[in-house]
Design a protein with these regions (language model features):
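Alpha/propeptide regions of enzymes that mature by internal proteolysis
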Residues: 2-4, 11-18, 33-387
Protein backbone atom coordinates (compact mmCIF):
# COMPACT_ATOMS: atom_id res chain seq x y z
CA UNK A 1 0.00 0.00 0.00
CA UNK A 2 2.88 2.36 0.85
CA UNK A 3 4.42 1.88 -2.59
CA UNK A 4 1.19 2.69 -4.40
CA UNK A 5 0.80 5.85 -2.33
CA UNK A 6 4.27 6.93 -3.31
CA UNK A 7 3.51 6.51 -6.97
CA UNK A 8 0.21 8.39 -6.74
CA UNK A 9 1.95 11.17 -4.85
CA UNK A 10 4.69 11.28 -7.44
CA UNK A 11 2.29 11.43 -10.37
CA UNK A 12 0.20 14.23 -8.90
CA UNK A 13 2.96 16.33 -7.35
CA UNK A 14 5.11 16.32 -10.49
CA UNK A 15 2.41 16.67 -13.13
CA UNK A 16 3.80 19.95 -14.35
CA UNK A 17 7.09 18.26 -15.23
CA UNK A 18 5.69 15.65 -17.58
CA UNK A 19 5.89 17.64 -20.80
CA UNK A 20 8.83 15.57 -22.01
CA UNK A 21 7.20 12.21 -21.37
CA UNK A 22 6.07 11.37 -24.89
CA UNK A 23 8.30 13.70 -26.89
CA UNK A 24 9.60 10.94 -29.12
CA UNK A 25 6.21 10.29 -30.73
CA UNK A 26 4.19 13.41 -29.96
CA UNK A 27 6.36 16.21 -28.74
CA UNK A 28 8.01 19.33 -29.97
CA UNK A 29 11.43 17.78 -29.84
CA UNK A 30 12.21 14.85 -32.11
CA UNK A 31 15.65 13.53 -31.24
CA UNK A 32 17.58 11.73 -33.89
CA UNK A 33 20.64 11.71 -36.01
CA UNK A 34 24.28 12.48 -35.40
CA UNK A 35 23.70 13.74 -31.89
CA UNK A 36 21.54 16.63 -33.10
CA UNK A 37 18.08 17.51 -31.86
CA UNK A 38 15.52 18.08 -34.59
CA UNK A 39 12.43 19.98 -33.56
CA UNK A 40 9.15 18.93 -35.10
CA UNK A 41 8.30 22.48 -36.07
CA UNK A 42 11.29 22.38 -38.43
CA UNK A 43 9.47 19.74 -40.48
CA UNK A 44 6.37 20.76 -42.39
CA UNK A 45 3.30 18.94 -41.08
CA UNK A 46 1.81 18.63 -44.56
CA UNK A 47 0.50 15.53 -46.31
CA UNK A 48 3.44 13.87 -48.11
CA UNK A 49 2.91 12.46 -51.56
CA UNK A 50 1.08 9.15 -51.90
CA UNK A 51 1.84 6.52 -54.51
CA UNK A 52 5.48 7.57 -54.92
CA UNK A 53 8.46 5.22 -55.16
CA UNK A 54 10.98 5.03 -53.65
CA UNK A 55 9.48 5.84 -50.25
CA UNK A 56 10.69 5.39 -46.68
CA UNK A 57 8.72 5.97 -43.46
CA UNK A 58 9.30 5.64 -39.72
CA UNK A 59 8.03 6.74 -36.35
CA UNK A 60 8.50 10.47 -35.71
CA UNK A 61 11.82 10.04 -33.90
CA UNK A 62 13.32 8.84 -37.18
CA UNK A 63 12.58 12.02 -39.15
CA UNK A 64 16.23 13.10 -39.14
CA UNK A 65 17.40 9.63 -40.17
CA UNK A 66 15.33 9.10 -43.31
CA UNK A 67 17.73 11.04 -45.52
CA UNK A 68 20.29 8.28 -44.94
CA UNK A 69 17.89 5.59 -46.11
CA UNK A 70 16.63 7.60 -49.08
CA UNK A 71 20.21 8.12 -50.32
CA UNK A 72 20.56 4.35 -50.60
CA UNK A 73 17.18 3.92 -52.28
CA UNK A 74 17.88 6.61 -54.88
CA UNK A 75 21.11 4.84 -55.82
CA UNK A 76 19.18 1.63 -56.43
CA UNK A 77 20.31 0.03 -53.18
CA UNK A 78 18.51 -2.75 -51.36
CA UNK A 79 15.53 -1.74 -49.26
CA UNK A 80 16.79 -3.61 -46.20
CA UNK A 81 20.14 -1.85 -46.40
CA UNK A 82 18.22 1.43 -46.55
CA UNK A 83 16.04 0.90 -43.48
CA UNK A 84 18.87 -0.54 -41.37
CA UNK A 85 21.14 2.38 -42.29
CA UNK A 86 18.38 4.81 -41.33
CA UNK A 87 17.69 3.36 -37.90
CA UNK A 88 21.41 3.08 -37.16
CA UNK A 89 21.49 6.89 -37.16
CA UNK A 90 19.10 6.79 -34.21
CA UNK A 91 20.75 3.78 -32.55
CA UNK A 92 24.06 5.69 -32.58
CA UNK A 93 22.55 8.85 -31.08
CA UNK A 94 23.01 9.05 -27.29
CA UNK A 95 20.33 11.76 -27.13
CA UNK A 96 17.61 9.35 -28.23
CA UNK A 97 16.82 7.26 -25.15
CA UNK A 98 14.43 4.87 -26.91
CA UNK A 99 16.90 2.77 -28.91
CA UNK A 100 20.54 1.76 -29.06
CA UNK A 101 23.25 3.71 -27.26
CA UNK A 102 21.74 5.69 -24.40
CA UNK A 103 18.53 3.68 -24.29
CA UNK A 104 16.90 3.63 -20.87
CA UNK A 105 17.91 0.51 -18.90
CA UNK A 106 15.98 -2.28 -17.23
CA UNK A 107 15.33 -2.40 -13.50
CA UNK A 108 18.87 -3.69 -12.91
CA UNK A 109 20.44 -0.78 -14.76
CA UNK A 110 21.34 -2.86 -17.82
CA UNK A 111 20.39 -1.70 -21.31
CA UNK A 112 18.72 -4.56 -23.21
CA UNK A 113 17.97 -4.13 -26.90
CA UNK A 114 15.57 -5.89 -29.30
CA UNK A 115 15.26 -5.71 -33.08
CA UNK A 116 13.88 -7.49 -36.12
CA UNK A 117 14.21 -7.23 -39.89
CA UNK A 118 12.25 -8.61 -42.83
CA UNK A 119 13.48 -8.66 -46.43
CA UNK A 120 10.60 -8.71 -48.88
CA UNK A 121 12.41 -9.79 -52.07
CA UNK A 122 13.82 -12.97 -50.49
CA UNK A 123 11.03 -13.39 -47.91
CA UNK A 124 13.55 -13.82 -45.09
CA UNK A 125 13.61 -12.53 -41.52
CA UNK A 126 16.01 -12.11 -38.62
CA UNK A 127 15.54 -11.09 -35.02
CA UNK A 128 17.37 -10.57 -31.73
CA UNK A 129 16.09 -9.92 -28.21
CA UNK A 130 17.46 -9.07 -24.76
CA UNK A 131 20.83 -8.18 -26.24
CA UNK A 132 23.32 -6.39 -24.00
CA UNK A 133 26.46 -4.44 -24.90
CA UNK A 134 25.81 -4.43 -28.67
CA UNK A 135 24.66 -1.08 -30.06
CA UNK A 136 23.38 -1.70 -33.59
CA UNK A 137 20.90 -4.51 -33.07
CA UNK A 138 19.00 -3.88 -36.31
CA UNK A 139 22.20 -4.72 -38.18
CA UNK A 140 22.67 -7.68 -35.84
CA UNK A 141 19.18 -8.98 -36.71
CA UNK A 142 20.10 -8.62 -40.38
CA UNK A 143 23.28 -10.60 -39.72
CA UNK A 144 21.24 -13.37 -38.07
CA UNK A 145 19.13 -13.50 -41.23
CA UNK A 146 22.15 -13.57 -43.54
CA UNK A 147 24.62 -15.77 -41.63
CA UNK A 148 22.45 -18.41 -39.94
CA UNK A 149 19.51 -20.65 -40.69
CA UNK A 150 17.74 -19.33 -37.58
CA UNK A 151 15.28 -16.47 -37.29
CA UNK A 152 15.79 -15.34 -33.67
CA UNK A 153 18.69 -15.26 -31.22
CA UNK A 154 18.27 -13.98 -27.67
CA UNK A 155 20.24 -13.01 -24.59
CA UNK A 156 23.88 -14.00 -24.04
CA UNK A 157 23.82 -16.25 -27.09
CA UNK A 158 22.93 -13.31 -29.31
CA UNK A 159 25.74 -11.26 -27.78
CA UNK A 160 28.28 -14.05 -28.33
CA UNK A 161 27.12 -14.37 -31.93
CA UNK A 162 27.51 -10.63 -32.41
CA UNK A 163 31.07 -10.65 -31.08
CA UNK A 164 31.94 -13.62 -33.29
CA UNK A 165 30.64 -11.63 -36.27
CA UNK A 166 32.82 -8.64 -35.44
CA UNK A 167 30.39 -6.41 -33.55
CA UNK A 168 32.00 -4.28 -30.85
CA UNK A 169 30.95 -4.74 -27.24
CA UNK A 170 30.42 -1.48 -25.38
CA UNK A 171 28.71 0.07 -22.39
CA UNK A 172 25.33 1.22 -23.74
CA UNK A 173 24.45 3.28 -20.69
CA UNK A 174 25.16 7.01 -20.88
CA UNK A 175 25.52 9.32 -17.90
CA UNK A 176 22.06 10.68 -18.68
CA UNK A 177 20.43 7.24 -18.65
CA UNK A 178 22.42 6.22 -15.55
CA UNK A 179 21.16 9.23 -13.60
CA UNK A 180 17.59 8.52 -14.68
CA UNK A 181 17.92 4.92 -13.51
CA UNK A 182 19.34 5.98 -10.12
CA UNK A 183 16.46 8.41 -9.65
CA UNK A 184 13.95 5.73 -10.65
CA UNK A 185 15.47 3.34 -8.11
CA UNK A 186 15.13 5.98 -5.43
CA UNK A 187 11.50 6.70 -6.29
CA UNK A 188 10.43 3.07 -6.64
CA UNK A 189 12.13 1.25 -3.78
CA UNK A 190 11.17 1.00 -0.13
CA UNK A 191 14.75 0.68 1.08
CA UNK A 192 17.05 1.82 -1.73
CA UNK A 193 17.44 5.51 -0.80
CA UNK A 194 14.57 7.94 -0.03
CA UNK A 195 11.24 7.65 -1.81
CA UNK A 196 9.62 10.57 -3.60
CA UNK A 197 7.38 11.29 -0.60
CA UNK A 198 10.32 11.32 1.81
CA UNK A 199 11.56 14.63 3.27
CA UNK A 200 15.01 13.53 2.13
CA UNK A 201 13.97 13.25 -1.56
CA UNK A 202 15.01 16.77 -2.54
CA UNK A 203 18.26 16.40 -0.66
CA UNK A 204 18.97 13.10 -2.38
CA UNK A 205 18.22 14.52 -5.83
CA UNK A 206 20.39 17.55 -5.12
CA UNK A 207 23.27 15.22 -4.29
CA UNK A 208 22.65 13.10 -7.38
CA UNK A 209 22.27 16.06 -9.74
CA UNK A 210 25.25 17.99 -8.42
CA UNK A 211 26.08 20.15 -11.45
CA UNK A 212 24.00 22.64 -13.47
CA UNK A 213 24.10 20.28 -16.45
CA UNK A 214 22.72 17.43 -14.35
CA UNK A 215 20.15 19.66 -12.67
CA UNK A 216 18.80 20.55 -16.11
CA UNK A 217 17.87 16.88 -16.56
CA UNK A 218 15.47 16.89 -13.59
CA UNK A 219 12.19 17.55 -15.50
CA UNK A 220 13.05 14.84 -18.02
CA UNK A 221 14.08 12.38 -15.28
CA UNK A 222 10.85 12.97 -13.38
CA UNK A 223 8.89 12.44 -16.59
CA UNK A 224 10.47 9.11 -17.54
CA UNK A 225 10.03 7.84 -13.98
CA UNK A 226 6.33 8.68 -14.01
CA UNK A 227 5.74 7.48 -17.58
CA UNK A 228 8.29 4.76 -18.44
CA UNK A 229 8.93 5.27 -22.17
CA UNK A 230 8.13 2.54 -24.66
CA UNK A 231 9.93 4.34 -27.46
CA UNK A 232 10.99 2.41 -30.53
CA UNK A 233 11.75 3.12 -34.17
CA UNK A 234 10.09 1.06 -36.90
CA UNK A 235 11.25 1.88 -40.42
CA UNK A 236 10.02 0.49 -43.74
CA UNK A 237 10.81 1.25 -47.36
CA UNK A 238 9.65 0.45 -50.88
CA UNK A 239 12.02 0.72 -53.82
CA UNK A 240 11.38 2.15 -57.26
CA UNK A 241 10.83 -1.45 -58.43
CA UNK A 242 8.30 -2.14 -55.67
CA UNK A 243 10.43 -4.27 -53.34
CA UNK A 244 9.80 -3.81 -49.62
CA UNK A 245 11.79 -4.30 -46.41
CA UNK A 246 11.35 -3.24 -42.80
CA UNK A 247 13.05 -3.15 -39.43
CA UNK A 248 12.02 -2.32 -35.89
CA UNK A 249 14.59 -1.58 -33.18
CA UNK A 250 14.17 -0.61 -29.52
CA UNK A 251 15.58 -0.51 -26.03
CA UNK A 252 12.14 -1.55 -24.86
CA UNK A 253 10.13 -0.45 -21.87
CA UNK A 254 12.20 1.59 -19.43
CA UNK A 255 12.80 -0.07 -16.04
CA UNK A 256 11.45 -3.41 -17.32
CA UNK A 257 12.12 -6.73 -15.60
CA UNK A 258 15.38 -8.12 -16.97
CA UNK A 259 14.63 -10.38 -19.92
CA UNK A 260 11.32 -8.75 -20.81
CA UNK A 261 10.76 -8.82 -24.58
CA UNK A 262 8.27 -6.57 -26.32
CA UNK A 263 6.82 -6.69 -29.80
CA UNK A 264 9.75 -5.17 -31.72
CA UNK A 265 11.64 -8.45 -32.32
CA UNK A 266 8.49 -10.50 -32.88
CA UNK A 267 7.99 -11.23 -36.58
CA UNK A 268 4.34 -10.57 -37.39
CA UNK A 269 3.84 -8.25 -34.43
CA UNK A 270 6.33 -5.38 -34.33
CA UNK A 271 7.51 -5.99 -37.90
CA UNK A 272 5.76 -7.64 -40.84
CA UNK A 273 6.51 -7.60 -44.57
CA UNK A 274 4.88 -9.30 -47.53
CA UNK A 275 6.56 -8.22 -50.75
CA UNK A 276 3.31 -8.77 -52.66
CA UNK A 277 1.39 -6.40 -50.39
CA UNK A 278 3.24 -4.11 -48.01
CA UNK A 279 4.71 -3.72 -44.54
CA UNK A 280 3.62 -2.69 -41.06
CA UNK A 281 5.34 -1.85 -37.78
CA UNK A 282 4.48 -0.46 -34.38
CA UNK A 283 5.51 1.51 -31.33
CA UNK A 284 3.98 1.74 -27.89
CA UNK A 285 3.03 -0.95 -25.41
CA UNK A 286 4.37 -4.08 -27.05
CA UNK A 287 2.41 -6.53 -24.94
CA UNK A 288 -0.85 -5.26 -26.41
CA UNK A 289 0.44 -5.55 -29.97
CA UNK A 290 1.78 -9.07 -29.45
CA UNK A 291 -1.67 -10.25 -28.35
CA UNK A 292 -3.22 -9.34 -31.71
CA UNK A 293 -0.18 -9.96 -33.98
CA UNK A 294 -0.66 -6.39 -35.12
CA UNK A 295 1.82 -6.22 -37.98
CA UNK A 296 0.42 -9.36 -39.60
CA UNK A 297 -3.14 -8.20 -38.99
CA UNK A 298 -2.51 -4.93 -40.83
CA UNK A 299 -0.79 -6.55 -43.81
CA UNK A 300 -3.61 -9.08 -44.16
CA UNK A 301 -6.22 -6.31 -44.03
CA UNK A 302 -4.29 -4.52 -46.78
CA UNK A 303 -4.24 -7.73 -48.82
CA UNK A 304 -8.04 -7.79 -48.62
CA UNK A 305 -8.24 -4.28 -50.04
CA UNK A 306 -8.49 -2.18 -46.90
CA UNK A 307 -6.72 1.19 -47.02
CA UNK A 308 -3.52 1.50 -45.00
CA UNK A 309 -5.00 3.87 -42.44
CA UNK A 310 -8.13 1.77 -42.04
CA UNK A 311 -5.99 -1.35 -41.59
CA UNK A 312 -4.04 0.36 -38.80
CA UNK A 313 -7.30 1.45 -37.18
CA UNK A 314 -8.69 -2.09 -37.41
CA UNK A 315 -5.67 -3.39 -35.49
CA UNK A 316 -6.27 -0.76 -32.81
CA UNK A 317 -9.94 -1.79 -32.60
CA UNK A 318 -8.83 -5.33 -31.82
CA UNK A 319 -6.63 -4.02 -29.03
CA UNK A 320 -9.52 -1.97 -27.66
CA UNK A 321 -11.81 -4.99 -27.84
CA UNK A 322 -9.47 -6.84 -25.47
CA UNK A 323 -10.48 -4.26 -22.86
CA UNK A 324 -14.16 -4.11 -23.87
CA UNK A 325 -13.45 -0.60 -25.17
CA UNK A 326 -12.97 0.62 -21.61
CA UNK A 327 -11.26 3.97 -22.16
CA UNK A 328 -10.13 4.20 -18.56
CA UNK A 329 -8.08 1.03 -18.97
CA UNK A 330 -7.00 1.84 -22.51
CA UNK A 331 -5.90 5.27 -21.32
CA UNK A 332 -3.05 3.74 -19.36
CA UNK A 333 -1.00 3.12 -22.51
CA UNK A 334 -0.27 4.27 -26.05
CA UNK A 335 -0.02 2.25 -29.25
CA UNK A 336 0.84 3.34 -32.80
CA UNK A 337 0.85 1.53 -36.14
CA UNK A 338 2.66 2.46 -39.36
CA UNK A 339 2.21 0.95 -42.82
CA UNK A 340 3.21 1.29 -46.46
CA UNK A 341 2.31 -0.72 -49.54
CA UNK A 342 3.87 -1.81 -52.79
CA UNK A 343 2.49 1.23 -54.61
CA UNK A 344 4.25 3.71 -52.36
CA UNK A 345 1.18 4.60 -50.31
CA UNK A 346 1.56 5.06 -46.55
CA UNK A 347 -0.55 5.49 -43.44
CA UNK A 348 -0.47 5.47 -39.66
CA UNK A 349 -2.86 5.42 -36.72
CA UNK A 350 -2.58 5.89 -32.98
CA UNK A 351 -4.82 4.75 -30.17
CA UNK A 352 -5.28 8.34 -28.99
CA UNK A 353 -5.30 11.61 -30.92
CA UNK A 354 -2.86 13.23 -28.52
CA UNK A 355 -1.34 13.13 -25.08
CA UNK A 356 -3.17 14.80 -22.23
CA UNK A 357 -0.75 17.70 -22.76
CA UNK A 358 -2.16 18.22 -26.25
CA UNK A 359 0.70 16.92 -28.41
CA UNK A 360 -0.66 15.18 -31.49
CA UNK A 361 0.63 11.90 -32.90
CA UNK A 362 2.84 12.11 -36.00
CA UNK A 363 4.99 9.85 -38.14
CA UNK A 364 7.91 10.55 -40.49
CA UNK A 365 7.82 10.20 -44.28
CA UNK A 366 10.44 10.77 -46.99
CA UNK A 367 8.98 10.70 -50.51
CA UNK A 368 12.22 11.49 -52.31
CA UNK A 369 11.98 15.24 -51.91
CA UNK A 370 12.47 15.72 -48.18
CA UNK A 371 11.67 14.19 -44.81
CA UNK A 372 8.57 15.55 -43.15
CA UNK A 373 6.05 14.72 -40.46
CA UNK A 374 2.53 13.56 -41.24
CA UNK A 375 -0.33 13.34 -38.78
CA UNK A 376 -1.53 9.94 -37.59
CA UNK A 377 -5.18 9.00 -37.69
CA UNK A 378 -6.61 8.10 -34.29
CA UNK A 379 -9.01 5.49 -32.98
CA UNK A 380 -10.14 7.76 -30.15
CA UNK A 381 -10.34 11.41 -31.13
CA UNK A 382 -9.31 12.71 -27.74
CA UNK A 383 -6.33 12.96 -25.44
CA UNK A 384 -4.97 9.92 -23.69
CA UNK A 385 -5.99 9.42 -20.09
CA UNK A 386 -2.55 8.03 -19.34
CA UNK A 387 -1.38 8.66 -15.81
Amino acid sequence: MERWSRRKFFLTSLASSFAAGASKLFGKEVQAGNGSNARAENFALTPPAQGVRPLIISSANGVNALDRGMEILKKGGDTLDAVVAAVMVVEDDPNDTSVGYGGLPNEDGEVELDASVMHGPTRRAGSVASVRRIKNVARLAKTVMERTNHVMLVGPGATRFAVAEGFEEMNLRTEKSRLAWLAWKASSSFNWRPGIDSPEWKEHMAALLDTPERQALLPWIESVIAHPPTGTIPCMAVSEKGDISATTTTSGLAWKIAGRVGDSPIIGAGCCVDNDVGAAGSTGKGEENIKISGGHTIVEMMRKGMSLTDACLEALRRVARNYNNDKKKLGTFHLFYYALNKNGEHGSASLWRSTRNGRRANYAVHDGTKARLAECAALFDEASGDE
